[in-house]
Amino acid sequence: MEVLPLVSGICCILGGIGVILHTNPINKIIMLALLEIGMIGLIVSCYYLDIAIVSSLCEPICTVILLLGYLKYLTTVKKKKRYGRNLPILSK
């Protein structure tokens, strides 16, 4: 029995369960990254190395974009609390 599909499957299952159960968005993004790592491992175990290279290059970029979007959301919420309902409008 090969070890790579087994470990990758466990990563996928743990990542999926973590995404469902966690309520903190940062933890959800981390668990989504764990799920993506498991998927890359399963792709490699099927010998689709070209697809694994592309997905391993795209996965960190997508994770960083998700983190930046969430941090932007947090700063917007904090500014709205600071200004109350009169959030300054920068454009019409």
UniProtKB/Swiss-Prot annotation:
UniProt KW keywords: Cell membrane, Membrane, Transmembrane, Transmembrane helix
Q: Its membrane topology, per UniProt?
A: Multi-pass membrane protein
A GO cellular component annotation in the UniProt record: plasma membrane
Which residue positions does the secretion signal occupy? none
Where is this chain's protein located in or outside the cell?
Cell membrane
Among InterPro entries, the record links this protein to: DUF2108_membrane, Prd_NiFe_hyd_3_EhaD
Q: Does the keyword Lipid metabolism apply?
A: no
One family name in Pfam for this protein:
DUF2108
UniProt keyword annotation of Calcium present: no
Descriptive protein name:
Uncharacterized protein MJ0526
Origin organism of this chain?
Answer: Methanocaldococcus jannaschii (strain ATCC 43067 / DSM 2661 / JAL-1 / JCM 10045 / NBRC 100440) (Methanococcus jannaschii)
Q: Highest lineage ranks of the organism?
A: Archaea, Methanobacteriati, Methanobacteriota, Methanomada group, Methanococci
